[in-house]
Amino acid sequence: ERCTSSSRLLVQDTIYEDFTARVAEVAKSIKVGHPLDPETVVGPLIHPEHESKVLSYFAKAREEGATIAAGGEKLGESGCYVAPTLFTDARNDMAIAQEEIFGPVLTAIPFADEAEALAQANDVQYGLAAYLWTRDLDRAMRMTDALEAGMMWVNSENIRHLPSPFGGVKASGIGRDGGDWSFDFYMETVNVSFPRSHHRIPKLGG
């Protein structure tokens, strides 16, 4: 339940099977538990209604043809604990790729080349955060110019410098918060003029 956590993972098709298998193993090893436990990585969801919403996407994923490679279940009898979940064999037009699930889920989608990766990345109504991993600086410059997101991290996880601007594009909002942008976000600029001395107002007409 972190707004800037990416829920879609676009992976080059030539490494898709191996990469997602490794991600599945990592997902299975993540400790879910009480948020005050120092060993906990993922805590509970905030409310039973939201837990029900997140759990409902597991059935949707299967109905649309995706595979649940890890997780896909509620943990324990009490509390709103959901196992970290990886969806594979997914397409970008599936509900698990197009809708905000806001849970411990990741949808892995293959792409063939840079153009397809960009098209899939931008083919959603949201645009808060994006992450790009590449060894090619020219590609990084091209992609960050074209990605439709308010915040981007290149070869980095989400580490935000608080004075930097925060905000999204498209259905993820308008405006920026953070640093000097905070003042603009909460204020309306108004121009008020006062004469500094007496002056004659020009007479118009006869």
Pin down the residues of each PLM region:
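ALDH superfamily catalytic-core signature
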Residues: E1-R91, V154, I201-L204
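Conserved C-terminal structural/oligomerization subdomain of aldehyde/semialdehyde dehydrogenase
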Residues: K31, F58, K74, Y81-G206
